[in-house]
Amino acid sequence: MPQSKSRKIAILGYRSVGKSSLTIQFVEGQFVDSYDPTIENTFTKLITVNGQEYHLQLVDTAGQDEYSIFPQTYSIDINGYILVYSVTSIKSFEVIKVIHGKLLDMVGKVQIPIMLVGNKKDLHMERVISYEEGKALAESWNAAFLESSAKENQTAVDVFKRIILEAEKIDGAASQGKSSCSVM
């Protein structure tokens, strides 16, 4: 097996959309039912995707809102971003659009690996954002999209595998686009 690659992924979104629950479900395989606002946590996990082992460093950020100022650390050495909203919250869906815009401004690149996640899909009766709305938003960003339920462990692993694939796809395109110049 090839040597493992290190990848750093930031998880961003409005408060109480399930960023920490999704991350803990992926890393530890358990659902934390209580809500304790996150300041910032970092988790690590080894995962194999398409035969390649990855050492993931996951930055679980504090909830942002439309007025949040992004710390510069959110753009340094980050290989991909998971943007999470709750399918039960119009506010979180609107704020994720603002977060995306701020992220593009901060990173300064047109194409960055982004995975849009509609979380809490198990709460059928409270749903206010349709699957189609989430998918359309992701397509407008040229981003990957999944809905998830951290509580029922639906697609948690898929979310993190997919962002790795998105990061590798963009890294591959960037390295193919590089030109070499020789001065003689």
Curated annotation (Swiss-Prot):
Propiece span(s): 182-184
Location of Cysteine methyl ester modifications: 181
Motif annotated as Effector region, chain positions: 35-43
Residues covalently joined to lipid (S-farnesyl cysteine): 181
Binding site for GTP: 16-21, 32-33, 35, 37-38, 63, 119-120, 122, 150
Domain of life (superkingdom): Eukaryota
Function: Small GTPase that acts as an allosteric activator of the canonical mTORC1 complex, an evolutionarily conserved central nutrient sensor that stimulates anabolic reactions and macromolecule biosynthesis to promote cellular biomass generation and growth.
Protein name from the UniProt record: GTP-binding protein Rheb
Organism listed in the record: Mus musculus
Name of the gene encoding the protein in the UniProt record: Rheb
